[in-house]
Structure formats: structure tokens, C-alpha cells
UniProtKB/Swiss-Prot annotation:
Enzyme class: hydrolase
Cross-referenced CDD domains: HDc (cd00077)
Oligomer status and interactors: Interacts with PrBP.
Originating gene: Pde6
Protein name: cGMP-specific 3',5'-cyclic phosphodiesterase
GO BP annotations, alphabetical order: cGMP metabolic process; signal transduction
Organism for this UniProt entry: Drosophila yakuba
Chain positions listed as propeptide in the UniProt record: 1147-1149
Cofactor binding description: Binds 2 divalent metal cations per subunit. Site 1 may preferentially bind zinc ions, while site 2 has a preference for magnesium and/or manganese ions.
Molecular function in Gene Ontology: 3',5'-cyclic-GMP phosphodiesterase activity; metal ion binding
InterPro entries documented for this protein: GAF, GAF-like_dom_sf, HD/PDEase_dom, PDEase, PDEase_catalytic_dom, PDEase_catalytic_dom_sf, PDEase_CS
Amino acid sequence: MHGTVSRSSSSSNMTDVSSPAGGAASPVEIATSSSTAATTSASASSSKPLTNGANKTAISTAAGVTPGAAPGPGCAAIPASGSSGNQVKLEHHYRQSNNNRPAGSNRSSETKLRSPAGESDGASRLMTPAGSSSSPSQSPSQSQSQSQASIQTQTSQQDRLVKAPSTTASQQDVDEVARLFEEKPEAFEKWLTERAPPEALSRLQEFIENRKPHKRPSVTSDLFQQWMAASPTVQQKSPRSLSNSSASSLPECRRHLMDLDEGELFMELIRDVANELDIDVLCHKILVNVGLLTHADRGSLFLAKGTPTNKYLVAKLFDVTQKTALKDAVTRASAEEIIIPFGIGIAGMVAQTKQMINIKEAYKDARFNCEIDLKTGYKTNAILCMPICNYEGDIIGVAQIINKTNGCMEFDEHDVEIFRRYLTFCGIGIQNAQLFEMSVQEYRRNQILLNLARSIFEEQNNLECLVTKIMTEARELLKCERCSVFLVDLDCCEASHLEKIIEKPNQPATRAIKSADSFEEKKMRNRFTVLFELGGEYQAANVSRPSVSELSSSTLAQIAQFVATTGQTVNICDVIEWVRDHNQIRAEDEIDSTQAILCMPIMNAQKKVIGVAQLINKANGVPFTESDASIFEAFAIFCGLGIHNTQMYENACKLMAKQKVALECLSYHATASQDQTEKLTQDAIAEAESYNLYSFTFTDFELVDDDTCRAVLRMFMQCNLVSQFQIPYDVLCRWVLSVRKNYRPVKYHNWRHALNVAQTMFAMLKTGKMERFMTDLEILGLLVACLCHDLDHRGTNNAFQTKTESPLAILYTTSTMEHHHFDQCVMILNSEGNNIFQALSPEDYRSVMKTVESAILSTDLAMYFKKRNAFLELVENGEFDWQGEEKKDLLCGMMMTACDVSAIAKPWEVQHKVAKLVADEFFDQGDLEKLQLNTQPVAMMDRERKDELPKMQVGFIDVICLPLYRVLCDTFPWITPLYEGTLENRRNWQDLAEKVEMGLTWIDHDTIDKPVEEFAACADEEIKDIEFTVTTLNCNQQSQHGSEDSHTPEHQRSGSRLSMKKTGALGKAVRSKLSKTLYNSMDGSKPKTSLKLLESHVSEDMDDKSPTSPSQPQASGSMGRMSASSSTSSAGGQMVDKSKKRSKLCALL
């Protein structure tokens, strides 16, 4: 059964909409009763009735109901949220709607949700109970009784929801309604779409809108959004002006204004223009309202334009009557643009003097121009012209009204005063409208510039599309007829000096440019090669490559050439006169059609002119303004960015192609030859013991180059990596040979160093039993990383790369060389026939490459210092499980550092030779820093401070090596030999450092060729002519005669750390250390030769001295300079007790 709607003119009416049987039930019942019935039902309703005069409305809202829920067996006015606050909001909106109704409206409604009997599912329908309509003769008490009886006939479910005197629904009622809404939401939706009355829908819409967050009130927000959302044609008209644009509707909508007095009319007309922000609509309203206030027949409004030095008036609207439609007025003003300079005519004089002009008889005034009357046939009698100023008193326009319509022949003082007062408010409105128009234009400009910025990235591979898009946007925004872009030949700009000489063989070979030819020379360098031209709105862009003759004959091209040469922006109002004033422009074509030109250079990031942008002729025939120039400058900047970005992109593509070619060539030459690979494949590989691979004392000094490769293969075999990961044997051999080939022949960081690092890792894994903590894949990655960790090393460190700003330092900002080593490793693996990981699964490949990368980067000592504290913390906490990803990475990093510096733990005869290689490489880098950077290198790289190397070796061991090996051997005791070897070498370096500090032991060679032990440790061997110098020990004492011994050489006595060969004095600290060294040397049977020599010289000197000798005073402690040889040593062996001589020596020291 379809719902029926019954309406009556009585004071009480009800609306009944019933649901069909078995169909969707109606969740809302709206009962419209009389005002007295609504008042009585308030006690039984869930909300208080709202009153508005004679109308009273009761709204019952079931809390907890949402608009999308299914209806339940209850009573609700409108589905709402569970809080009473929403009900209050709804009542507030309803009160507002009642207040907005006209007086005398007698519509009151009571909204309830009820279920008819017999519907167990809780569905409800909109119905009108019998007897609810009351006649006008019924008393309020009778109507109240009938209303109460109607409520009492509801079902028990309805009574649970509507209870008096409760103002809110119970939670049980809410649950029942919510349950029904959740079970049957489609029933509620169907009722809303098919059977809900318009009044219920409107109230529901108000309730939904009320729940939305309110926007901040703004006078211009809605208009601005509507303006920007409209099309460009609609933007030219105000949205609110369209309804008032017809000539017939304007008098109708203003007819009620005639009933207002003058004050009310004035205020009403002010309100009419107060919030109007469309400049066209505002000017139209001003003229119509002024005509209404002053009884003027028609009026015109002029707006001030131009620069401060060249101002003029432009007719915004002209000859507007009260019946003139806005569209007609705007069209006529646009078609016949009237421009009046300041000081010309009536309006021009008012604008210049800011004084009002009231003319009673226009034809008798010399300033009046009667040409308009002759064209239109209209006769002008009286004119009232008045300036429009802003709040600062500046002229922003002029308003002019003509002829009275009330029978008067002139404008009296009353008209003048009303006109002046109204224009005061109009000045504020006009300036606001202009500011709003400027904001809209600025918004559009910003949107265009954002689109241009987006286009730069989208069209970076297509220069023609990018320039065409920029030109199109510039033409549309600046309203010009044509637009052109000239691009400079950049290859010509970057031509070498030799090419210029070849082009001009008759010119002298000099870089100097004659002043007379400077402009022509610049023109040659800024030669245009590409021209983009864009004509009218429906014309496509034209791209051409003009010839030299075409550029020379074109005036526009010559002007563009002038801009490119000078780098200046030109804004030309009269092209013919400008060309006449510039003699450099020698064009042949006609320029009659060209009126105005705006030409601007396009520059790249280096401020080089790469093109010229040119605008030709404004659409309205006026010159380009400063505002146009500023906007066009933004287009030129974006055009320059786009062109520069496109060229950079092209260059990057070329460089990438070159890089690919270079990598192919490098890969070919970096790969081992097939002959070498076949030879190594067929060679027999000795056992690991024959190479001493399991020992931490391994040395490669006795191995030839081929043996080093065989030793590497043996390590892979012993770790079972070849069969485990199915590495083809020929691929492994080729990879080993390729790795060896890619190491440079530097003194230390070469292939031999990589072999030693890999062997130490192998010994740690096998002998040190570290393999139990590693997987086979990690062992493979660690060995590969050890062999590749210094690939392509240049003999310089990261600091040198940064100082010299090398390409590697630019490519890698941190761990420069280590990243390069890893990249070289990847390059070799990617070379044909060198991928030893080819049989791995993708997951295993990623895992092993991650291990290799992390291990190689860990060889940077900066990374070691970052990881060391975390590793020490784990060890101190007793960590024994190293299988976590982070912990395994820390352990591998420490192992890589331990292997990288393992030369410090080799036997002393190996260690000091390796130290010589390291020192040589460091000294070479120091020499490069002095030569290339003109800086003083650090001590360990300064060849002049090579005597400090033993001391620096001790510091290196103390800071890096010993702490690392100590913590490793404490955790993994099987690698203790590394710690013990380092400790032994530290003692040797410390002993050498002390002797060097005393000056007793240093061989004057460029490198550490022979340690002092080689000539001082063998007491049994015969000493052959070793020159030894003993200087004065008590050097500060003078003889009694005030002069030094004649045998004492002259020397500088201030230094205490100079060698004895160079000086004749020892400081107190040096004598103390020397005494300590001598005592330490007395270990029993075989004192060192140096000690024997010193004792021999001292005993001979003491035996030769006599206490009474006149030539040697007793007070003098001087000792002569003597040369020690083998014969002297043997001949000087007098029968002197050895302990006695030692005691005398110690006494002297």
C-alpha cells in the first residue's frame, strides 16, 4: 500500500505514509498537530517542544541512532547520534527555521517514530490516527485530550521509547533501534529514497550539515572558491551578477527601494556594494545606485591605470542607465575602450586636481567633448564629475553622472553631498575589489608557474614540447598576439680558441678582442640555431632552424640578437623609433604590423645567455607594462631552467652511454686472459701445509706470483666452497687471476697484501676455530671480501682523496676507497666468466653480497672505531651466541680489521720488512701532498720525520692492534698467537724507539732498510770498521781556563733528542734512558757489541788520563772524539776489571 499524504487548512493536520505489507517499514512518523496539542504532548515526548510565536514544534529524537542504521521498534524523530547535544543542535536549527518563517504561517509538526500493531519486526509507518483532526471550534483542552489519547494507543514498544517526563531515551530503547537499523539498513534506505516526506528529508539534511565541522567565516572565501572553480569565461562575470543581468529584472528587484526614505535608501545601497568583490559588478551597482540616489539619467566610471609618471583613466563602464544590463555595459566598454590621460577633458581634470566639477550647461564648457553625443544622438546638459579616492587619498577612479530625471536641469548641493558621501564608501569597495582581482590573478599566475615547474620534470627529454608549453602559457596569461623563443648555439659558445683561429685565419693569434669589433664578436658567439614561434590562439607552434641570412634580414631576430649580446631586457613601445636609435640593428623586413615588443634574455644556472624570449603586441594594442615584464621574467626563468635541465639530461644520457662503453672496455681488459686461465686450471695445487696456510706466521716472501694464486685456490678447496656452492673450477681460476690483475703495483696495498689478509682469515677460521661460528655462505663471503678489500688501491688513503677532490671522493662521500673496492669487486663478478656466485639462489646471492659489502667497508678504520664499542660491550657482557644478524655483522667486522692489520703480528724479521713497505707508501703520499696540495703532511707520511716511525708504530699497536687482539683472544682463545706476536713486536718497536730517541741507533737511509739489531745483536761476529761517535757527556762544564777542549767539535747544545753523531751533548732524560738501556743489556755472558765498544772507549780514555796531567785539568770532564774500529777495540783491551769499567761508565752517565 502506497503512502497517502493528507493536508487540511485546519489548525491541526497529520501526514500518514504507510508501508506495504511485508515491505520495508517506515522508521519515522511525522505527526502535524495544532499548537495546543503540541504543547500537551510535550510531557509525553522525549524532547521539549520549541515555540515560535503561535507555532509550536515538538521533536522527539531517539539517542544513538545514525542516519544509515536500520529502524528498530521505537520512537524517534530523526535518526541521530547518542548524545543529547546533537538533539539540542537539531532543535536549534529547527528554531532558526521557524524564526525565518513569515508571520501568520500556521504550520507546526510533531515528529515521532512509532510501530503499528501487528508488525513484530519493529517496522514503523507514517500514519494519521483517526480523530486526530480537530475542527476550528474545538477548545484547546479538547484538542489536548485527543492528542493524549492518540499517544496512549501506541504499542508497548513505542511506550518504552516515549515516556513522560523523561527527556532522553533509555539505553534499552537505543539498543532496540540500533539493532533494527543494523539488521535492516536497506529498509531504512528504501524508505528514505521512496517514501520519506520532503520536510523530514530537509530536517535530516540540516542535522547532517550541523554535524559537519564549520569553516571559518570569511567574506571572500565562498566567492573566491566559486570564482576559481568556474571556467575562464565565467570568471569574467560575477557569480552573483548573472541573476540581475537582464534589463527587465533590474527595476523589479529595486521597486521596493522606492518606498524607503533617504537615510534607509542610502544605507541599503551601501550594503548592496559593501561585500561585492567583482569589479565589473561593483562598478555597475555603483552607477545604478548613484542614479537612484541623485535621480541621474546615466553615468560613467573610470579607473586609474598606468605608472606614477604616466597615469591615465580607462572607462570601466560608460553611459550606464538604471535599465542597462551588466553584460551589455561590459561588452560595450570592452569593445570601445576609452583612455583619457590625466589633465585632459573633464574626467582627466578631476583626476589630476582631485576636485569635483559640476557643470550646468555642458556645451558651454570648453572641456566637454561633444563627439559622444553626435554618435549616440543623446544631448548632455548637466554633468557632475567627482574623484574616487582610497584611504590614502590617492586617485583610483572618477565617477561621472549626466542629466537629472526629476525635472531639474542641474545637480544641486544636496546631490553633490550625497554623491560625495556614497563615493567615499565606493572607494573602499573598489579598492577591495581590485585587491581581490589581483589575488585571483596572482593565484592563477602561481598555478601556471607550478604547472610550468611540473612540466620541466615531465618534459625533460623533449625540449620542443617544453618550450611550446611555456610559450602557450605566457601568451595566454599576458594576452599577446605572438610569442617567440630563440635558442643560442651552445656548441659555438664553447668552441675552443683554436677553432676560432681556424675560422678566422687572417686574425692575429691573440685572445684580445678589439673594442670596435666587440659587439660583432659577441654576436658571433651568441648565434641562434633554433627558433620557436607561436602565433594566434588556434595556431600550432612552429620550430625551425633559421639560416644566417634569415636572421640578418629579420628585425625581430636582430632585436633578439641585441638582447642576447647585451644581456638586457628591452620593452619597446615604438619599434621603428627604437630601431632608428640603435645603429647595430640592420634589418631589411617590414615591421609595420609590430607595435610593441617585450624581449628578455634566458639564462642558465651559470648566468650564461642560452636564449631569448620575445613577446609581440598586446591584444588590446597598449604597450607592455612593468607588471607584464615581471611576469614574463618568471616565464624566462622557468624557460631557462627547463632548457638547462633538458640539456643536462641529454648530457647525462651521453655520459651514461660513455660509461657503459668504458665499463665494457674495462671489463674486457680487467679480465684474465684465456691462456692464463687454462694454465692455472691445469696446474697442480699443493697441500695447505706446503704453503703454511694454517699458521699465523705465514709469509709470502718465498712465493712466486703463480704460487699465490694456487694458495688461494687451496684455501677455497680446504673450506669445501668449490663443491658446496658448485663453483666451476675454470670460473674460479679466472676470477682469482682477474682479481690479481686489478691490483695496482703499489708498494704495500697490492695483491700480496690481499693474499696475506685472506690467509689470516683462513687461519682464523681453521686454526682459530672461528668457522664454527660461521655458515658456509658467510665463509665464502669473508674470503672473497679479504681478496677484494683493496682492489684498485692507488697508494693513497681516503683523506688524500677528499683533499684533492678526486672523482672518487665526489662519488663516495664516506669510506671513499672502501666503496670503490667493493664496486670493483662487483664489476669483476659481473664480467663474463668471472661470476663465482652464478650457482647461488637469488636469496643466497643477496646474502653473500651483503656479507662482502659489509666486510669490505669494515676495513675502513673509521668503521672499526664505530663498531668497536658495541663489540666490547657484547664481550664484557659474556656474549657467546653470535648468530644474530647485528652480532654476526660486528664479529665479521672485527675479524676483517684483525686480518687487515695482521702484519703487525708476524715474526719480527717479516714485520720490519712490511713496515718498510708501509712507510715507503706513506712517504710517497706525503710527497704528493707537498707537491700537489702544498701542505705539510702528517708525521707518519713525512719523509723528513722518518726517525719517528718506531714511536708511531708503538702508538698504532697500543691504540688499534693490542685492544682488538686482546678482546678477540679473550673470547676466542684459539687466536692467541695474533695477540702474542703483536706483543712481541711491540717490545721490539719500543726498544728501537728508545734507541732512536737517544740517537744511538738509526741508519741514515731513505727507508727502513736495516734495523739496528742487524749490526748490534751479534757479539760473536767480528766487527768491521763501524764508525761510532761518543760525545762529551759533561758538556756544560768548561775548563778552568774558560775554554772548551780543542778536540770537542762545535755544535748546537740545545737539543736533547739529537743523535750522538750529529751533536756533542746528551740531555738528562736521554742519559737516564741510556743508563737504563745499558743495565738492561747486562743480562749475563754476552753483552751487546755496542756496549762493549762504549766500555772500551771509556776505559781507554780513563786509563790515558792522569790526575796530575797538566794538559787535562781535573775539573774538566771532557772526552776526546775517537773513532772505534776493530783494531782499536782489540788493542784497547787492557787488564781492567769489567765490573769496574761498567761502574765508571755508569758514574759518568
